[in-house]
Amino acid sequence: MAQYYPGTSKVAQNRRNFCNPEYELEKLREISDEDVVKILGHRAPGEEYPSVHPPLEEMDEPEDAIREMVEPIDGAKAGDRVRYIQFTDSMYFAPAQPYVRSRAYLCRYRGADAGTLSGRQIIETRERDLEKISKELLETEFFDPARSGVRGKSVHGHSLRLDEDGMMFDMLRRQIYNKDTGRVEMVKNQIGDELDEPVDLGEPLDEETLMNKTTIYRVDGEAYRDDTDAVEIMQRIHVLRSQGGYNPE
């Protein structure tokens, strides 16, 4: 699977797993479809999907070879609007991180657009398809309720120290650790609007599990420079890219 990511470390293998669409993601928790809708905050549970155009089968589109070749996703067929989910991942051994998320999303999900910044990652697609993708991202090893945050705005906190419960900082306090149950609850949607009832996100992963699943190189975990294969490949790409830019011949 070297085409997905180089390296012989566990971190490198975890990156390959996320980016390989044939790898079956481990399911770690159960979140209902209704709770996913609440977390996203784009429509009310049970509300019809708002549309931006008629269903494709009702549209009189001109003949196009590409349109005939490519099967549209369900939301495009129905005329759904485009919506998003955005994650923030703690630098303290979160399972995923922004660039890995984007690579993985583009390998795994059709009809979706991924955008990456240093501390956040967004995926946009048609609304009903987004809900399916979001459910998978929230229920599987992509997500830890303490070290991963669902944040549509005010995302800061990925590089800050964890609190006494091991939770990543969130200025809007969307995800709260319940000390009575030992579980994390989402009390606001990704935008920061308060929910009528909290959504149970499950127990935080323990430190050993996080260290085993993380895609983040750290000197107090697996150091990047110790993964010789990954370093050599990345240096080769950087050198050839630089040389090609200066002298394409």
Curated annotation (Swiss-Prot):
Keywords: Cytoplasm, Methanogenesis, Transferase. It is found in: Cytoplasm. GO terms for molecular function: coenzyme-B sulfoethylthiotransferase activity. It catalyses: coenzyme B + methyl-coenzyme M = methane + coenzyme M-coenzyme B heterodisulfide. Its main location: cytoplasm. Coenzyme M binds at R120. Binds 2 coenzyme F430 non-covalently per MCR complex. Coenzyme F430 is a yellow nickel porphinoid. Methyl-coenzyme-M reductase is activated when the enzyme-bound coenzyme F430 is reduced to the Ni(I) oxidation state. One of its GO terms (biological process) is methanogenesis. Signal peptide: none annotated. The keyword Transcription does not apply. Pathway: One-carbon metabolism; methyl-coenzyme M reduction; methane from methyl-coenzyme M: step 1/1. The keyword Amino-acid biosynthesis does not apply. GO terms for cellular component: cytoplasm. Pfam families: MCR_gamma (PF02240). It comes from the Archaea. CDD domains: MCR_gamma. Its EC number is 2.8.4.1. SUPFAM superfamilies: Methyl-coenzyme M reductase subunits. Its cofactor is coenzyme F430. MCR is a hexamer of two alpha, two beta, and two gamma chains, forming a dimer of heterotrimers. Belongs to the methyl-coenzyme M reductase gamma subunit family. Component of the methyl-coenzyme M reductase (MCR) I that catalyzes the reductive cleavage of methyl-coenzyme M (CoM-S-CH3 or 2-(methylthio)ethanesulfonate) using coenzyme B (CoB or 7-mercaptoheptanoylthreonine phosphate) as reductant which results in the production of methane and the mixed heterodisulfide of CoB and CoM (CoM-S-S-CoB). This is the final step in methanogenesis. This is Methyl-coenzyme M reductase I subunit gamma. The lineage of its organism: Archaea, Methanobacteriati, Methanobacteriota, Methanomada group, Methanobacteria.
